[in-house]
Amino acid sequence: MKAHYRSFAVTQRGVSATILLAALVVAAVVAVALTALLVNIFERKQEAKVTTTRLVEVTRDDTDPAKWGVNWPKQYDAYKLTAQATRTRFGGHGGSEALPQQKIDKDPWLKRMFLGYAFSIDYRDRRGHAFMLQDQENTQRQTKPQTGSCLHCHASIMPLYRELGGGDAMKGFEATYQMSYKDLNKKLHDMGHAQPVSCPDCHDPKTMQLIVTRPAFLVGIQKLAASDTPTPFAPSIERWRAAGKKVAYDPNVEATRGEMRTFVCAQCHIEYYCSSAMPLTVPWGKGLSADQTEVFWNETKMPDGGRFFDYKHAETGAPILKAQHPEFELWSQGVHARSGVACADCHMPYARDGATKVSDHWVRSPLLNISRACQGCHK
């Protein structure tokens, strides 16, 4: 009997030892796994703190994006993808040909509607930002005299404006409408700045903060701010008004980062008037709606004192107002603006790169990137 109890006790001790050993092994595995997880989290947090490694110094006069790409390779690689042909059922260029198809060949009524305007000569589907200067240089519209103001939004032109204005970009800008496109474009090439929209057009080279640089936009947004038109899409303007309008509204000082994610696009994706008759003009003095824009143009006079018009129809002689591409104006009146959604949220949505979050610099239609551009909200 004693032998039986002794054997049972030994067996129990063996089982207890096995359980204890198994528990120790499990605890060790869990401890190792938790340690690895915590180390990974720590490393990711440290990685997220280092958003860039500056290998070269860049300035506002470095218009070649390749130089910026040394410091910010992910953004540069994405920017280069704007050279790819993309198309949705609403527009774009998805073909393999050198130039997009002529819209005036596909829809001949456009040619007649634009008679007296250069769009009756050449009007094609759009391509990406990478081609914005090249396509402008090669368009058949150049067979007619064009103003230097056309380069305002098709080139990284700020260094040239500063050169022409003796260091004052606004003065340089105001001088270019009287110059021919051919002459101004030659100066751009001679200075080595013949680049499409580039990094310093939207980023401060020292801080990488978003900035707006285009003179016509700055003049236009100041006129909008000085008006009495409500601007729920731009709360910084409302705050500036409430503070007493002590100095001219400056989006680079007053605007939030969220607003700037729209304003950098609104430098060019807007309604405007561009000709050799007057400096490039943005019609926001009365507001951004179509009716308010019409009031602004109706109160605007041509240099000879006559009624403002974009062009006179060659067949009927009727003065025509032609809307350009008022995307910012349309956005400002829509549900996305009311919801605080910026242009970049949909056209340059955030993407994960390791532990860091970056804006996708492949600027394109949200319909080509629905999972990140749309489904963050529309689920």
Each model region followed by its residue ranges:
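Hydrophobic alpha-helical positions that pack around
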Residues: 1
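Long, charge-dense tracts
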Residues: 125-149, 191, 196
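Aromatic/pi-system hotspot detector in well-structured domains
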Residues: 129-133, 154, 203, 269
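A cross-kingdom signal targeting lumenal/periplasmic-facing segments of multi-pass membrane
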Residues: 143-160, 166
